[in-house]
Amino acid sequence: MEIPYTVEPRRDTGLYNAKVGIWLFLASEVMLFGALFSSYILLRVGADIGEWPQGLLNVPIGTVNTLVLISSSVTVVLGWAALKQGNFAKYRICQTITLLCACAFVGIKSYEYYDKFTHYQVITKDGKVFDGHLVSKNKDQVVLHGFEIDASKGKAAGVTAAHKASHGGHGKEIEIKTAEIQKIGNYGPAHNTYTSIYFTLTGLHALHVIGGALVMGYILFPGAGMWKTEPERYTNRVEVSGLFWHFVDLVWIFLFPVLYLL
C-alpha cells in the first residue's frame, strides 16, 4: 500500500508527511530545552550576590564551537540546494563537511568535559580551599597545580580567580596530605548547581548533535541508493534531517551566551 503525501504536500497543511512530523517533534524539543533554560535562569537570578560561579568556562573554545556549528548549518543548506539542482556530488561534499563539523564539535566538547573532570577543589580540615588541575593522587597525598582560593574576595569570586589563573598555566604545585583533607571533588556534575545544569544542558545538546550526525550519515552513505530510484523523496529526507540540524544549531546559539558569557 502506498502512503500518500510522502513527496507531495498535503492539501490541508501544505507540507508533506515527514515535514509535518519533524515540526511536531521539534515543538516537543522546544518544550524540553525551554524548561531547562527556564530552570537555569531561575537558579541564576535567585542566587545570592557573589555566590553564582562565573568565568569557569573557556570562552574562546566555546566561540570556536559556535563557529563550527554555524558553518555546519551553512553546508547543510548548500547540500540540500545541490540536490534540488540534481547535483549529488556537490551534496555529498557539503554533507561530508557537515559531518566533519559535527565530529569537531563533539571532540571540542569532550575536551571541555575532560578539563572539568580533571580540575579539582580541595577543602582542608583547617578551612583552606585549593583549586587546580590534578597532578597526582594517592593514599598519602593529593598534588594540584593551582592556587589557594582567596576567601576575602568572596567564595564565587575566589574560585573564579583561581580557576582562570590555573587555566592560564599559572599557579604552582600544591601538595596536600590526605589526612588533612575534609572534602575533595572535581568540577563534574555533582560539584554544585552550576556545573550540574551545565552538564545537563550541554550533555543533552551533545546527544542531539550525535543523533543528528548519525541520521545524516545514514542518509549520505547507506541510504544514498534512494537518490537513484526516488530522488525527490531522498531530497525530502535530507531536508527533514536538515531542519533538525538547524534546531540543534539554534539551541547552541542560546546556550553559548547564557552559559559562557552571562
Regions found by a protein language model. Give the residues of each.
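...captures the hydrophobic TM-helix bundle architecture rather than a specific catalytic motif
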Residues: 1-262
